[in-house]
Amino acid sequence: MAKSAEVKLAIFGRAGVGKSALVVRFLTKRFIWEYDPTLESTYRHQATIDDEVVTMEILDTAGQEDTIQREGHMRWGEGFVLVYDITDRGSFEEVLPLKNILDEIKKPKNVTLILVGNKADLDHSRQVSTEEGEKLATELACAFYECSACTGEGNITEIFYELCREVRRRRMVQGKTRRRSSTTHVKQAINKMLTKISS
């Protein structure tokens, strides 16, 4: 059997936005009512995405990490889900600063991420409009989803699958760039040698 591709995904957002519930809904198709929001967990999950077996390592961050922990998680991850709660404007306002930290830690690479507005079942308490989420996603140059980990509303599976696809696309582009770059170096070295020989 062919070896599966491995992808490291990390979930970030303020404590209480439903990061753990989102991950558990994706993995088990169930909603958990009680859990410790201060716990950090890592899950391994295998899925077939576009006819290819992919092993996801998913880091569910606690949302209360200190700076050193958070930066370590950001270095570890290849793809990121930035989650906010549509009923909590403060959690939405924390997304852009999080993205800026990610950019700083990951540079010069572009960050692969998806923006998620969770708790879409609580539309009556909404503080962040869908349009605001879409506008921020455009600024961040990423896909945007609204969903509910509680009811399963929105395509939660697609969030994780699309992030895996995007990570794998970026890997392929970076691999081609590296190959082109090394080919250029070889050509330059040969040209230098030929110049020396002919002079």
Curated annotation (Swiss-Prot):
It is an enzyme of class 3 (hydrolase). This is Ras-related and estrogen-regulated growth inhibitor. It catalyses: GTP + H2O = GDP + phosphate + H(+). Binds GDP/GTP and possesses intrinsic GTPase activity. Has higher affinity for GDP than for GTP. The gene is RERG. Keywords: Cytoplasm, GTP-binding, Hydrolase, Nucleotide-binding, Proto-oncogene. Belongs to the small GTPase superfamily. Ras family. GO terms for biological process: negative regulation of cell growth; negative regulation of cell population proliferation; response to hormone.
